């Protein structure tokens, strides 16, 4: 009972993190872009 009550409150507790969760899938794309820019900066050696 206590566990189900805790789980029921989780969505409200995590509502604060929704913007972060929306951004998370984009982060690997930033790493790919960073790698490309880094290679361009050193001249694709």
From Swiss-Prot:
Transmembrane segments: 23-43
Matches recorded under InterPro entries: PSII_PsbK, PSII_PsbK_sf
GO BP annotations listed: photosynthesis
Cellular component, GO annotation: cyanelle thylakoid membrane; photosystem II reaction center
Source superkingdom: Eukaryota
Subcellular location: Plastid, Cyanelle thylakoid membrane
Keyword Plastid assigned: yes
Membrane topology according to the record: Single-pass membrane protein
Keywords from the named record: Cyanelle, Membrane, Photosynthesis, Photosystem II, Plastid, Reaction center, Thylakoid, Transmembrane, Transmembrane helix
Propeptide, chain numbering: 1-8
Keyword Transmembrane: yes
Function comment: One of the components of the core complex of photosystem II (PSII). PSII is a light-driven water:plastoquinone oxidoreductase that uses light energy to abstract electrons from H(2)O, generating O(2) and a proton gradient subsequently used for ATP formation. It consists of a core antenna complex that captures photons, and an electron transfer chain that converts photonic excitation into a charge separation.
Similarity comment text for this entry: Belongs to the PsbK family.
Subunit organization: PSII is composed of 1 copy each of membrane proteins PsbA, PsbB, PsbC, PsbD, PsbE, PsbF, PsbH, PsbI, PsbJ, PsbK, PsbL, PsbM, PsbT, PsbX, PsbY, PsbZ, Psb30/Ycf12, at least 3 peripheral proteins of the oxygen-evolving complex and a large number of cofactors. It forms dimeric complexes.
Protein name (database record): Photosystem II reaction center protein K
Species in which this protein is naturally found: Cyanophora paradoxa
Species lineage: Eukaryota, Glaucocystophyceae, Cyanophoraceae, Cyanophora
